[in-house]
Structures are given as structure tokens and as C-alpha cells.
Design a protein with these regions (language model features):
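Short, structured segments at the rim of ligand-binding sites
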Residues: 1-423
């Protein structure tokens, strides 16, 4: 599917943030590991979370899926599947599932998309080797063998992906000797690790960590207990609607964004405020009023998913917008630093790619044109927002990739006044 976005000078109305992808993934995993019935109210159904749901089913849980409620029936015991677990393009699914399948003590096969297999896996391989678990990679297939791991002390890099840390933490409490996880480099996206720890706590499993989050300890013998989750809105997805309001100087209300969310990308509200937008909270509703924007320096080490949409904001801000701490964006669904640079430049942006970030000179008068999503959901959504202030229509190729994280994205854009044409 391709989508043409018609420029829109003013938005209005309200929408609801899609449910949190990060929380949905983690609640599914914790439900699998619990003995009993775990309920997810308002879960996110998208390509990635559906991949995790399929993995949970493959490992022995029974899922009942309704429109706004998922129910997980599990014994808390993992069974080795007869067929490969398909992780699709979901990095979270793959990185959470590998440590879990090692607990079965059986040879278990997984498979993933070609693009996912280009993303780093080595830190997890090296960590599991210390637990006498081997990962063999053959093309798009992954074989895990050598378990079950007994636990103990394990070292891992913290600056490649927080998902490796979260995956090991989920599995750690089920190891005979518990788990001590030592990070050899500082953790990035710390709030996602904190979110994992909070979901585990809600299921009765406690993780101890030091202040700088370089050492984690899980005592053995802890049991996951079933619970009920109400999944709140996703800041990383809502960022696109909020940015659309900011660049069009519009007033928009976004529901279901609690101010105390543990997700790293909630910092986006602070960034918007620093750039000049007016932000107000009323309970769990964010009210944004777009105003003249100014460029700022933003380090996104703990919130890398914001990189593409921050580059778009930079195109509409006065002065320089410098985005740093973004080296990990090269290993996402696409090389996001290269992708957003090439596509924004194609429609007139003054943007420079750097080794670990981007420099945008604004305001950049964007023009009509055709751009490529690189089959990357966050690139597609960022380009759709960029098109709102362009001098003419912008066509986005392969825009269906938004279903990876935000299936209703274009519908939600239309709900606040944007005209889109699918073709």
C-alpha cells in the first residue's frame, strides 16, 4: 500500500493514543510464566505484539483474544514447540523468546525476517554461552540448544539493546541459582528495563539493581503470579500525532497518556515544550498547542525511537536541531539515520547525517514529492507528518509497514483533519 498525504495547515480534534507496545509485549511474557489466568485489558494488536502472542502460544499458554481484552491461561511451565517459532520482524519477540526457550532444555528453532536477522544478536549469544546455552544462526533460522541454564553470574553489553537485558531478566527467576546480570557498558533505554522490572514485580518477581543499573540480581525460587493489566497509551506512537499538531500550530487532545508512564519516550513532551509547543495535562489527556518552534540539542540515548520524528520537527524549527546518542538507529528496521536523511532531503530538508545522530537546519521549506518508507514503520509515520507542511502532496511508498506498531495511524491522522489517499 502507498499513501499520499495532502498538506494540512491546521488540525483540530482529539484522538486516543494506541496501547503501549512495550507493555503489551511484557505483559504477554509475564502471563506465560505465571500459573493461572492473566488478563490484558486494552492490549495493542499489531504485527509485533501478535508475534509475541504467537510465541507465548507456541510455548504452552492458551490465549483467548477479543477486541479489547486478551486472556492468557498458563501453567507457568514452558513446553518446547514442535515447529519453529516465527518472530516475524519483531526484535522484542526474538530477544525475549531466545532466553525463554533455553529453559525448556530442548533444541528449539526460531525464525525471523531477513531484516531482523541483520540486527545485532551477538551480545545475547555471548551472555547465553556463559550459561552453557548455544545459539546457532543459519540464514533466517535460529537454533537454541544446551539448556536449561542453571543461572549464576553473567556479563553482557548494555549499550546495544535493552531488550537483551529484559529477556534475560524474565528468564532469570526460573533458573535454579537465580541470576546476577552485570553490564559491561552502561544501559541505554533504561526506562524499558525499568518497565520490565515493574511488570515482573506486578507478577510477584522482584529484581534488585544498583543505582546506575549496571548490576541486576534475581533471587532463585520466585514464582510468577497471574494478574490483570490495563495497558495505557504508547508515547512513542503518540509522538507522531503530537508532532503533527506542533508543526501545524494546532490544538489537539490525545487521550490515555498517563504522566507517570515508565516508557522512555514520555520525554517527548518535555522536548516539545523546550522547542516551543504548549503542553498541558488534564488527568491522562495531553493537550498540545503548536507554536513557533526553535531548534535544540537532544540526546536520545534512552529514547532512540524518537529520532525520525525529531528530525521532522527540526525541519520546521528555527535554527539548528542536533540529535545525538542515536548510533543504535542504524540497526533498526532500516538504518534510520540514513533513511530519514535521504528521504527528508529528497523533499527539500537541510539535513546532515552524522555518525551517531543528525543535524537539521531549519526551517526547511519542504516540497511535494515521492519518498520511500524503507519498509520501516517509524520512517513512514515520520514522513507522513513531514508532509503536512510541504508545498504539495507527498506520496509515501510501502506505507503499510505502519501495521508493525500502529495499525490505525492513518485513521488517527484523518480523525484530526488530515486528508490521505491510499493507492
Amino acid at each position: 500500500m502507498n499513501v499520499t498525504v495532502v498538506p494540512c495547515r491546521s488540525l483540530s480534534g482529539e484522538t486516543t493514543a494506541p496501547p503501549s507496545k512495550a507493555s503489551t509485549h511484557r505483559a504477554l511474557i509475564a502471563g506465560l510464566l505465571s500459573n493461572g489466568i492473566t488478563e490484558l485489558a486494552n492490549p495493542l494488536s499489531c504485527d509485533d505484539t501478535n508475534a509475541t502472542a504467537n510465541a507465548v502460544s507456541a510455548l504452552g499458554a492458551q490465549l483467548n483474544i477479543e477486541t479489547d481484552r486478551w486472556t492468557i491461561h498458563s501453567t507457568g511451565k514452558l513446553s518446547a514447540p514442535l515447529h519453529p517459532i516465527d518472530c516475524g520482524e519483531s526484535g522484542v519477540t526474538l530477544r525475549f523468546t531466545i532466553p525463554l526457550v533455553s529453559l525448556t532444555g530442548e533444541k528449539v528453532a526460531l525464525r525471523a525476517s531477513e531484516s531482523l536477522m541483520h540486527r545485532p544478536l551477538e551480545p545475547l549469544e555471548e551472555a547465553l554461552e556463559q550459561l552453557h546455552v548455544k545459539i546457532l544462526v543459519r540464514g533466517r533460522a535460529i537454533l537454541v540448544e544446551g539448556g536449561p541454564p542453571k543461572g549464576g553470574s553473567v556479563k553482557i553489553q548494555g549499550d546495544v539493546s535493552s531488550q537483551f537485558v529484559s529477556g534475560l531478566l524474565f528468564a532469570g527467576s526460573l533458573m535454579d541459582n537465580g541470576l546476577e546480570l552485570l553490564l559491561t557498558t552502561p544501559a541505554e533505554s533504561r526506562n524499558y528495563v525499568l518497565l520490565t522490572m515493574e511488570i515482573m514485580r506486578q507478577h510477584g518477581v522482584r529484581v534488585q539493581s544498583n543505582q546506575d543499573m549496571t548490576r541486576f540480581e534475581i533471587a532463585p525460587g520466585q514464582k510468577y503470579l497471574p494478574t490483570m493489566h490495563r495497558i495505557h497509551g504508547d508515547y512513542s506512537s503518540a509522538a507522531f500525532i503530537l508532532a503533527a499538531a506542533a508543526i501545524t500550530h494546532s490544538k489537539v487532545l490525545v487521550h490515555d497518556l498517563p504522566p507517570t508512564q515508565l516508557e522512555s519516550d514520555s520525554v517527548f513532551l518535555k522536548i516539545l515544550s523546550q522547542m516551543g509547543a504548549k503542553i498541558e495535562f488534564v488527568d491522562d489527556i495531553v493537550i498540545i498547542e503548536g507554536r513557533e518552534l526553535k531548534g535544540i540539542h537532544v540526546d536520545i540515548r534512552d529514547s532512540p525511537d524518537l529520532g525520525p520524528i525529531l528530525a521532522v520537527l527540526g525541519c520546521y524549527a528555527e535554527g539548528e536541531t542536533l540529535i545525538t546518542g542515536a548510533a543504535r538507529l542504524r540497526y533498526k528496521e532500516s538504518d534510520r539515520l540514513a533513511s530519514i536523511t535521504s528521504e527528508l532531503a529528497a523533499i527539500g530538508a537541510h539535513i546532515t547525517e552524522r555518525e551517531d545522530g543528525l543535524l537539521v537546519h531549519g526551517p526547511s521549506p519542504l516540497r511535494a514529492g515521492e519518498v520511500q518508507s524503507h519498509k520501516d514503520h517509524r520512517i513512514a509515520m515520520a514522513l507522513a507528518v513531514a508532509a503536512l507542511g510541504a508545498s504539495g502532496k507527498v506520496a509515501i511508498r510501502d506505507a503499510e509497514c505502519v501495521t508493525k506498531s500502529y495499525p490505525t495511524f492513518f485513521q488517527d491522522l484523518r480523525s484530526v483533519g488530515v486528508k490521505t489517499i491510499e493507492w
